[in-house]
Structure formats: structure tokens, C-alpha cells
Amino acid sequence: HHLRNGDLVLPQVMAEIAAMGIRDLTLCASSLSKNHTCLIDYIRLGVITGIETSGMRGELAEAISRECILPKTHGGRARSIERGERRIDVAFIGASCCDNMGNMNGCLGPSAFGSMGYAKVDARFAKKVVAITDHLVPYPANPISIPQTAVDCVVQVERIGDPQLISQGATRKTRNPVELAIADYASQVIIAAGLVKNGFSYQAGSGGISLAVARYLKDYMKANGIKGSFASGGITSTMTEMLQEGCFEALLDVQTFDADAVASIRDDPRHIEMDAEMYADPQAKGNVANELDVMILSATEVDTNFNVNVLTASDGVIMGALGGHPDTAAGANLALVVA
């Protein structure tokens, strides 16, 4: 998931599993991307007979949209794993940097992708944990996102993925005048609500409109001397710019969306890695979603009663992911849909 369209870990793992003759597996992934079309063959062969994920895209989504899958939000997935409702037998975790004992991170190495927020929960609760890396370093690796105490074995491969493809597709900056107009209206609503003040907290998505809203808010905050407490969620270069320019005290990062954000989490101690439990587990002792003042939600469909679809197109074909949308919409003081 963290390498998104650049991921090469899942295809390599599934090829080995299929070659061993293993069948009837449930794939419990935090999310699936366009480059995971190889799963179609493994489903047809019976290697994979069940999928739990927040979403998927591309040919894989089209192929199985008429089948039965169980979509889960990021917070809901963490909750089900921690409460033992979903037991993970083996977690294969891609790490851009790892030592021989399994201490690992995602912010160093040639395939650096940033936060390992989703994998942290898997590492804590899976029966067996396999670290997969293309950058084996002398002991101890530093920093440590997932420690050796959670890891059963380390596998070195030629390449875990292409970090240049992390931001492809779902993350984009828009120049579309309609989308910019929507973003302008959305920022005016947030400001008029009286929530943009010193100490406020914020989450923006990775879509074009959401990122444009953040840029409009940045201009307003700088013009009025406003500094928020934190921004959270999937972190993009837009959010790291706001951190560097004094708009927020900190960033809480469960997933890093582009190269600039990877550099930020590596170099700036104010850019903090968090796991999916801390982010949005509804039954955790405390989660970040419930501390949000404002969250921006992109959608594929919205009806006149404000019911929101973020997973499928109007024809029922899966084209996105639940992500943390329902989690943060439930927790934030203001949930704003832009579409």
C-alpha cells in the first residue's frame, strides 16, 4: 500500500505462494492499486478466495466488482485486527531500509516511501512477520519504525518498488477552473465556520480539489497570522509546505504520498509517523480522527441528503477506496465534501 502504483512486493510474494501450491487464502491488504492486476489470475486459480481491503483501482477493480469483497476503512481494519476479529497468519511487509534483525523503516534507501503507518498494526498482531527489503544495512537500522521484536525473518530482494509511482493517479494538483472554484467555495465555508484559528487541526485528502483547498487555506492563514496545531492523514508536499511555512506545529503521517513528503518525514522531527490505530481506530483509547476540527472529503457520488460514496462509480465498478474517509468524517467537527 505505501508504495501504491510502484509496489513490487505483493506481486513477488504472490508468485512465490502460487508456486508453492498454496490455495484458499484471504488477502487482507490496507489497499490495492492499479499495478496489482496479477491478483486476477491468482483469484481464478483459487490461490486467493477472499479479499479485505479499503479499496482498489484499475483492471483488478473491474474484474471483481461483481464478486464479494469486504471493504474496510483504515481505522476499521486496524480495529478488527487488534480485537482479533481478523487474524493475520503472515504479514509480508516491504521496507525501504532494514537490518539483519528486522529493524526497519520506510524513509531511507533507494525505494524510500515514508511512513509505515498501516504496516505497524500488522507487525504487532500477525502470527508471523516477514520483512522484505532491497536495502539491507548494518545493525542497527535507524530510525526504527517497526522493531526486530515483531519480526520473524528478513528477505532481501532486488527491488521492492518504484517510489516515483507513489503519487501517480490518486494524488494530483489541479488547474481545472471548475475544481478550483469548488476549492475556493470550500475554503470560504471553512473560514466562515470560524474554525480556522490558532490551534486548529486539519486533514486534507490527496485529490486535486482537496489540495487546492489546502493552498487557499494556507494563503488565508499566512495573511492572518494563524498557526494550527497539526495536520494529519496521508501527507503530501502541499502539507509539508504548510509545515515549513509555519501554518502548523506538526504533521501526523499514516501514509506519505510523494517524494517531497518522504524527504520531510526523514529530515523534519515535526513530521511524525503514526500507525493506523492512532490515526482512526474507533475503539482505541484515543485517536487522531476525533481530534480533527476540519476534514476535506473527496467523493465519487453525493446525493441530496448528503450520503456519500467514495468507493464506486455510478455503474457499481470499484474505482477508489474507503481510506480513512468514514473514520475522519465521523470524528471531525466539520466534514466537508468536495466533488
At which residue positions do the language-model features occur?
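Conserved alpha/beta enzyme-core scaffold
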Residues: 1-339
